[in-house]
Amino acid sequence: MNGMTTGVIEQPKAARAPSASKIWLKAIELTARIETLPGRLFADVVDDWAQRQPDRIALATDDASLDYEGLSKRINRYARWARSAGVAKGDTVALIMPNGIDYVAAWLGISRVGGVVALINTKLVGQSLAHCIGVAKPAHVIVAHELKDALDGASPHLKTEAKVWTHGDARCERAIDVALAALDDGPLSPGERGDVTIDDRALLIYTSGTTGMPKAASISHRRILNWGFWFAGLTGATPQDRLYDCLPLFHSVGGIVAPCSMLAAGGSVVIAEKFSASNFWPDIVRHDCTLFQYIGELCRYLLKAPPSEYENRHRLRLVCGNGLRGDIWDDFQARFAIPRILEFYAATEGNFSLFNVEGQPGAIGRIPPLLAHRFPAGLVKLDPDNGAPLRNAEGFCIPCARGEAGEAIGRIGTADEGGGRFEGYTEASETEKKILRDVFAKGDSWFRTGDLMRLDEKGFFHFVDRIGDTFRWKGENVATSEVNDAVRDFTGVIDATTYGVSIPGTDGRAGMSAIVVNEGFAVEALAAHLAQRLPAYARPVFIRISRELDATETFKQKKAELAREGFDPGAVSDPLFMLDPKTGTYVVLDAETYAQIDEGTIRL
């Protein structure tokens, strides 16, 4: 591959980090021009770089690469394919392909001429896959040949008909590779481009679906441009940068933020098919990457992995992502010699973001006073029993005090109005569920993030938990994320997820942690460890030792099924343990013990 190197790479000389104000101002400068050119889409950004540096690598994988000129031409072929296939402005094309160069080229090209591209999770099968396709109502589906069986398996559940095009197999009846090869790759004429503007919908990106069926969030061309240039500014990206992206391209962080931040700056994106802890550092060194995009669980997996001879031979200057917890921040940065961490908070469908440009360990960001109008965020108190916002005598929501956890909300509107745009979902009813009205004044409206946060005395926001993941036990709120951190820090625990389970005759829900362990795990010492880390009400009452934990493609844990199975040894084949209220240690939970809990003989 062009530009690949091997062996030891000389570490760059330590450069003084730019001030927070300069970082913010750079991002503002790069995004300020978006509104002045409403007909300029992200594909035009690629074209501009293709004119300036045609031979520089834009996208690369282990076995292929495209320079900027090649990417520009590939985008044009996909745009002309959409037109030739009859894709009109607003029509949807579903994309079911693994990470790769053509993934990015496809959605950039199809959306350039007004098509809307639905980015479908490649791990879905059956009814789940049919649901996501059905929500999008596509006229066409582009599917990788290796994923065609999954699509065929979902066909009986599909209620919409779409033309299916196969990618990667020229022998198929509708082979998109063959169709693309027959099309011109030169610049599009004004007539071919049509009247597409930044206000138009470009993509459908699905929520993770950890608690239910995924919802399709609407992503406009404006949002793509803002994400790309904003992160290019925050990271100080240049054409010399190479970013490693091993996150799924069908999600907003891996598929839009990571590649577009580099392409906006003329840099290069190295795309891995998926995350691999064993391949991660060799890839970083081999491709001479200067940045990588992370999510928090990726960092935790890397810390749990055995040392690699490559982990300190990199030339990284910055890593960017979200979800890096405070309990591993310092260890992660020190072990892997990472000069700077840019942590941020954002929701695919949300209308405000937070950015920790100062590198404050454990914080997800702050809002500088000069940008308060651009990122209008607040924290409101919630009813601990039902999760609804509390209201005062006048009927308005109650702001949280410093240090107090509450739901993060963002005011809906334009920047000029002191708000942020909320583009919502494809279903109006789902959009309405996320809007909180008459919050601090009659007639105002705010986006509900569904996330609990607290604001510290320095003005930094800290993530506490997802509202649906928090439960009450012994009259106290338990944040599952904090419990997970404590459990994972115990010797021999590879992974953990925590949830609440109901016990007959008790109020609230008791904590239960499902864990994956190795040979170093000793259950008899776990209770003492947790007693040092957690208050009594937050310590898991039950422990389940599982072979593996189910998670989404971005490592968000799926715990609904675990919660339904509960702690009944008759329904769960995994080993179960209970925190004995008499001894304070974890003991085996068998059928006899379960019956005593059910009868109230053992009171927890």
Please identify what each model-predicted range represents.
Residues D67-E69, D195, A202-N226:
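Conserved AMP-binding A3 loop
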Residues P54, T166, D184-Y206, M213, ...:
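Conserved pre-ATP/AMP-binding loop-to-beta segment of ANL
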Residues L124, H131, V141-V143, F292, ...:
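AMP-binding/adenylate-forming catalytic core of the ANL superfamily
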Residues R286-Y294, L303-P384, R421, Y425:
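Gly/Ser/Thr-rich phosphate-binding loop
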Residues W24-L25, K148-I198, F375-A377:
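ANL superfamily adenylate-forming
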